[in-house]
Amino acid sequence: NLETMTKFLYICIMWISVCVDALSAVFQFSVSGPVGSTAVLPCELTSVDTDTLYIRWNTESEIVFERLGEKTFQGEGYEGRVDVSEEELRKGKCSLVLRNLRLTDAGVYASYETARTAGQSLPISQKELLISRIKLSVNVPPNKTRMIAAASA
C-alpha cells in the first residue's frame, strides 16, 4: 500500500535526521594554559546571520558568556575576563577569549548558536545548535608551585 510505504519512509527519514543531528560535526578540542594567562577556546560558525548575531558559551553548570549583537552577558566569576568580539563574530569567528585563567576555570565549555528554521505551515522558529565543546585545563607553572611550597614551609 502506497500510503503505508510513504509513512514508513517519512519515519525513516525523521530517524535518520535525528541520528545525523545527534552525531553532527561537533568537535572537542583541548586547550590548556597556566594560571594567570589567556586562553582562546576555538569556535567557528558554519554560516553568519548578521541580523541576529548570537553566541553563547557555557560550562555544564553555568552560562559563561552570551552575546546578542552589541549586548553581552558575562557569568558570575567571569566578569571582565571573557569576550567574543562583535567584529570577530561578524566574520564567523566565535572563539571565547578567557583572560587571567584560574584553576577553577578548568572544565568543558560548549558554544551554541541560534538557527532559524521554517516548517511548511509553521512560522519561523529558532533552535540552538551546539557548535563545539572545548576541554580547558589550567595548570600551575613550576616556578609558582615552588613559591607556594616555600611560602607554606
What are the functions of these language-model segments?
Residues 38-44, 81-135:
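Ligand-binding face of N-terminal immunoglobulin V-set domains in extracellular IgSF glycoproteins
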Residues 1-31:
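N-terminal Sec-dependent signal peptide, specifically the hydrophobic helical h-region
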Residues 10, 36, 62, 103-106, ...:
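Disulfide-stabilized cysteine-rich extracellular repeat microdomains
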Residues 10-13, 17, 41, 92, ...:
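Secreted/extracellular small peptides and ectodomain modules produced from precursors
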Residues 34-38, 50:
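Short, surface-exposed loop/turn motifs at beta-strand boundaries within globular domains
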Residues 27-34, 45-46, 150-152:
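Short beta-strand segments of immunoglobulin-like
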Residues 14-26, 58-63, 118, 126-152:
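Flexible inter-domain hinge/linker segments at boundaries of tandem extracellular adhesion modules
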Residues 46-81, 119-120:
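N-terminal V-set
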